[in-house]
């Protein structure tokens, strides 16, 4: 369920903008508000959305998949999430408007945890979720890495459901954490001075999906194409500002979130602000290799036609 959800349950199949009246638009994030969402904070701060007659409400979810659920039900207009979650199964009423952010990532092991992996001991990996999709990929990362080292492993690797505080979980004794992003956990592990072993997707030739797309519903898009185009262009305009002005990125993040300034958050923003993409990357083309990987590894069973239908031509 989405937080601040008093507005939910009201469907918005058609929104018409008349006489410059601002439209209330709801965007559900994939997790808690963080620097990956800077474009939306900047677009609000610079009145980019306001000038487009868009009154944006940003919503944090209780669950990682809430945004997709609310899009499907017509309760919100936009959502952000990793492209993998679009591809892992067919969504008849969800489409991507493009890819606006990409980092790199995978599994981060503690020094001792990685030694246990190589020594064929039981290994415990923390993850915010455990399901066939994410577990299959995590175990495939390990399998491919060990094959590259010609290491044979017999003992079990367990995925332990924890929260998303990956580095804390490693410090608390778990052997590794997944899915870690370089601009977050990579930064934090360096700042903490931890001795870790990173096994990222690109290290084992698995297509990257440590990224965020902007999603809407097909029904909303069909009835509001101009608004969707405006929202995308407004976000792209905000990204142009961010990637050229670290000081402003720092300012707007703290001013909009009211968070206390910390060395960790400063470092995360400094690593993040250059990773935004403008114009958005074409997701249909960009995630094709990821789609092929999910089909080959029986993670997804959607057809090529279904895959192609989940991306907007915009």
Give the ranges of each region predicted by the language model:
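Secondary-structure end/capping motifs
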Residues: 224-296
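Cationic, low-complexity basic patches in intrinsically disordered or flexible, solvent-exposed regions
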Residues: 12
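Short, surface-exposed acidic
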Residues: 149-158, 257-270, 300-307
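Short, glycine-/small- and polar/acidic-enriched structural segments
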Residues: 24-159, 175-179
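Basic polycationic patches enriched in arginine
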Residues: 3-4
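Conserved C-terminal helix/tail region of periplasmic/extracytoplasmic solute-binding proteins
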Residues: 291-314
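Pocket-lining segment of extracytoplasmic ligand-binding domains
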Residues: 83, 165-257
């Amino acid at each position: 369920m989405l937080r601040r959800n008093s507005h939910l349950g009201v469907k918005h199949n058609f929104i018409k903008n008349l006489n410059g009246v601002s439209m209330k638009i709801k965007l559900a994030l994939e997790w808690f508000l963080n620097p990956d969402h800077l474009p939306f904070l900047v677009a609000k701060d610079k009145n980019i959305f306001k000038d487009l007659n868009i009154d944006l409400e940003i919503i944090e979810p209780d669950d990682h998949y809430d945004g997709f659920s609310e899009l499907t039900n017509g309760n919100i207009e936009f959502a952000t999430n990793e492209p993998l979650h679009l591809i892992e199964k067919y969504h008849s009423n969800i489409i991507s408007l493009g890819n606006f952010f990409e980092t790199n990532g995978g599994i981060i092991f503690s020094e001792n945890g990685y030694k246990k992996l190589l020594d064929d001991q039981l290994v415990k990996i923390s993850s915010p979720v455990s399901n066939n999709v994410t577990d299959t990929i995590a175990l495939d990362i390990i399998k491919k890495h060990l094959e590259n080292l010609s290491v044979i492993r017999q003992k079990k690797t367990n995925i332990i459901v924890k929260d998303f505080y990956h580095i804390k979980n490693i410090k608390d004794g778990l052997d590794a954490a997944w899915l870690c992003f370089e601009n977050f956990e990579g930064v934090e592990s360096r700042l903490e001075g931890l001795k870790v072993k990173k096994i990222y997707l690109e290290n084992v030739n698995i297509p990257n999906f440590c990224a965020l797309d902007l999603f809407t519903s097909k029904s909303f898009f069909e009835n509001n194409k101009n608004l969707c185009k405006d929202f995308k262009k407004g976000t792209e305009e905000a990204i142009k500002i961010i990637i050229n002005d670290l000081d402003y990125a720092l300012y707007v993040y703290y001013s909009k979130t009211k968070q206390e300034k910390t060395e960790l958050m400063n470092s995360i923003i400094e690593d993040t602000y250059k990773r935004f993409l403008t114009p958005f990357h074409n997701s249909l083309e960009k995630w094709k290799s990821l789609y092929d990987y999910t089909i080959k590894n029986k993670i997804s069973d959607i057809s090529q036609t279904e895959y192609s239908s989940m991306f907007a031509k915009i």
